[in-house]
Amino acid sequence: MSAFIKLFGTHSERELKRIYPLVDKVESYRDAMGALSDEELRDKTKEYKERLEKGETLDDLLPEAYATVREAAKRVLGMEHYRVQIIGGIILHQGRIAEMKTGEGKTLVSTLPAYLNALEGKGVCIVTVNDYLAKRDSEWMGQIHEFLGLKVGVVLNSMTNAERREAYNCDITYVTNNELGFDYLRDNMVIYKEQLVQRGLHYAIIDEVDSVLIDEARTPLIISGQSGKSTRLYEACDILAQQMKRGEDVPEYSKMDAIMGIEQEETGDFLVNEKDKVVSLTQEGVKKVEQFFKIDNLADAENLEIQHNVILALRAHNLMFRDQDYVVKDDEVLIVDEFTGRIMPGRRYSDGLHQAIEAKEHVKVKRESKTLATITFQNFFNKFDKKSGMTGTALTEEKEFRDIYGMDVIEIPTNRPVIRVDKQDAVYKTKKEKYHAVVEEVKAAHAKGQPVLVGTITIDVSETISAMLKREGIQHTVLNAKFHELEAEIVAAAGQHGAVTIATNMAGRGTDIKLDDDAKEAGGLKVIGTERHESRRIDNQLRGRSGRQGDPGESQFFISLEDDLMRLFGSEKLMDIFNTLGVPENEQIQHKMLTSAIEKALLKIEGNNFGIRKNLLEYDQVMNDQREIIYAERMRVLNGENMRDVIFKMITDRVESCVDTCISSELPKEEWDLNELNQLLTDIIPLEPVNAADVDSVKNNKELKHLLKERAVKLYEAKETEFPEPEQFRELERVVLLKVIDRKWMDHIDDMDQLRQGIGLQAYGQRDPLVEYKMAGFDMFDDMIANIQEDTVRLLYHVKIEQKVEREQVAKVTGTNKDETATNTPKKRTAAKVYPNDPCPCGSGKKYKQCCGKMA
C-alpha cells in the first residue's frame, strides 16, 4: 500500500492536483478586483445573479466570485484568504470535507462557498457546535457578506419563531446543529403554514463536521411532550364505563330475517365484538357519554380524545382480563405474554390502553411522556441537497463519512509547515503515579515560562490535577464550565508566557490559542493529555491546539495501566506482564509492545462505536421512509390543497376493507354475515344497514362493494351541502386530517420505539432483528394508515355545522433531549404575584383562592 501511495500519492494529493489550476484562476482576478471601487465590488453580486439566470452555473462563476469575496474580506476585516484557504473553499463547494489543521482559518474559508451558493437565492446554513460560535461568526464574517449586499441571519436558542423565520429567510444563516434539527421537527408539527420557520434544506456548511456528524450521531434529536391533557380523563372514563350497560350480542342477521322484515334492535349502551376485539357504542351509549361529559356531539373533532378514551375504558373492562392478559404487582400493571405466559416488565400497551387498565385496577395512572417527533443527525443532514464540512481531524473517520454521508475527506496542506513535536506516550503503572508525573511536567515547563494546556476527559480529573497544582503553588485556570463566552476568553489567554490551563478535551474548540513572543521563545504551547480518548480523532484535536501557523510546540499523552481504555480494551496478558515485572514507583514504562497495544485498543473502540452508529442509522432508516410519507402528506394539508379526492379515496378504501373483512369473494350469498358487516361499516359510515333486497340486487361481493361505495359517496356529498360555503367544509377536512395524522403518528413513534427495544430478542431465534424490525414496522405503518383513514372518515361523516372549525395542536411540547442550560437564563416574573387572600384580578370581588385561584 505504501509503495502505491509513494508512486501515485494519497487520495488528497491526487485531488489537490486537479484543484490547483482553479486556484490559479481565482488568483488571476486579484488585480482586477483590487481596482474596483466599493460600489463596483458590491454590484458584482447583482451581476453574478443575473448571469446565473441566463444559464451560467455556479462552477462557471466560482473563480470570479471567490476573488470578489477575497477582496471584500481584505477591505472589511483586513484579512486576505491564503491559497490553502481558497483550496478549502473549492472543496466545500464540491460537497466534500476539508480537513484543515487548527489555526488555518476555517471560519474565513466558509465565507467563499457560502457567498457563491447564496447567489442561487435558496439559502445557505453555516452550522456550528454552540450558540456562542454562531453569534460570533455571524457578526464577524457576516460583515463580508453584508458588504457584498447579502443578508446574514443567526438562529439562537432564545429566539422566538418570528425571529427564527426572519433568520432562515436570509441569504446566509448561522445556526447550531441542534437548533437546525429541532426547527425542522417543529416545522413538521405546526398546524398553519404561516407558523413554518425554515425554508427548503438547500446547502449546509458544517463547522467541526466530525463533532456534529459523528460524535453526536449516536443520540437522535427528540421532541417530547404529554399527550392527553391529564390522567384524570382515564379515571373519569373508567367511572363512566362501570355505569354503562353491555348490550346483548346481536344474533347473525340472515337473509331470511331480512325477507321477513325483522329489524335488529340494539340493546344496552355498547356492544362487544369479541372475535374482532372491538367495542362500539350504541345510540343510547353515545347519549350517555354526551350527558356525562356535558357535550353536544361526541363525534365533533374536539371530542376525539373523549371518544377514544371511553372506548379504551370499555375495552379495559370487557376485553382485558386480570391474571390472563395482565397481572397487578407492586401497584403496577404488568403485561403477560399471550404465547409464553411470561410477565413482560417494562412493556406497556400503546395508545392509552395501559392507562385505561391502570384506572380500572385503581393503581397510579402513569402520565406518559410521549415522543412527538424524532430524527437522527444522519438522516437529517442527508435531507440537504448539498452538504460539506470542515474540521481539523476527519481522516481517521473517512470511511464513515464516505459510507454514511457520501462525502470524501480531502486533507489540505498547512499554510506553513507544522513544527510541533509529538512525543511518545508516557505510561505509568497507576493513576496516582501518572498524575504525579503530569504535575512534575507542568512544574518544569512553568519554571521556564512555557505555556501549558492540560487536557482531561472528565471534570473529576481536571479538579484532581487542579488541587495538586494548588499544593505546588502553581497559578492556573480551570476550564470545564458550559459558558462558552467565558471559555473563549480563557482559551485565547492560554498562549501567554507562563500560563497554565486545565481544560476538558472538547472545551474551547473554535478559538485560537495565539502565542506571545516570550511564549514562542520558551518553546511554544506544551499540550499534555492526561488520558487517551475513545477516539484518536479527539486526541489529535487536543494535539492540534499547539503548533498553529508554523508556531513551535510539543504534545504528549500520559497514560496509566488503570485507565478505562487499558482496563477495558488493552490485552490482559500485557497488563499481567507489566505487573509481574515489578516496575518501581513513579517510574515510566516504555515498551514497543505497549505502544502497539494502545493503538490496537483505540482501533477496537473506534470500530465498536462506528458499528453502534451504523446500526442506529439502519434502524432509523425504516422510520425515516415512513416519516417522509407522513411529513409530505402534512405539507399538502398545510399548503391548503383540496383534500376532497383524498377523502373520497379513504371512504372507498374503508368500504372495501369492511366488505373484505366480513365477506370473502368465495363465499356464497346465502352465507354472507350481514350483521357483522353492518356493525363494522355503520360504526364508521352511517349508511342504512345492508338488507336482503341489497343482497338480491348484486351478484358477488365486488358488486356489493360498488353499491356501498356509491351510497357512501352520495351520503358524503349530502353532508357537504349542509355547509353554506364549500371552502368551510374543505378547511374542516384539513383540520380533521391534521388532527388525526398527528395523533396516530405520535402513537406510531411510540409503538415503533417499543418494537425496536424488544426486537433484539429475535436474534435468539436465529432471525435477523433488522429484517424482523423492517417487516413488523411495515405492517404497523399499514395499520396506522388504515386507522388514520377510519378515524378521518368517521369524524367527517358525524360532524355538525354548529361547531367551530379551528386547528389545534394535538400535544403540547414539554421539552427536547438536548442540553440547553448554557443558553437559558432564569425567567423573571413580569406581573405582580397574587396571594391567596388578595382580591381576584378578574374583578369578581371574591378572594383569589375562592375564585380563579381554585383553577390554578
Regions from the PLM with identified roles:
Residues 326-334, 340-348, 549-550, 557, ...:
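Extended, charged helical/alpha-beta scaffold domains that provide interaction surfaces
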Residues 448-462, 639-641, 693-699, 841:
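Short, Lys/Glu-rich amphipathic helical modules
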Residues 1-582, 631-632, 648-649, 653, ...:
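Conserved P-loop NTPase motor core
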Residues 110, 438, 825-827, 835:
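Active-site-adjacent structural elements in folded domains
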Residues 830-849, 853:
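Short Cys/His-rich zinc-binding micro-motifs
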Residues 454, 502, 745, 781, ...:
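Hydrophobic, well-ordered secondary-structure elements that form the walls
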Residues 27-31, 617, 779, 838:
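Positions in alpha-helical segments
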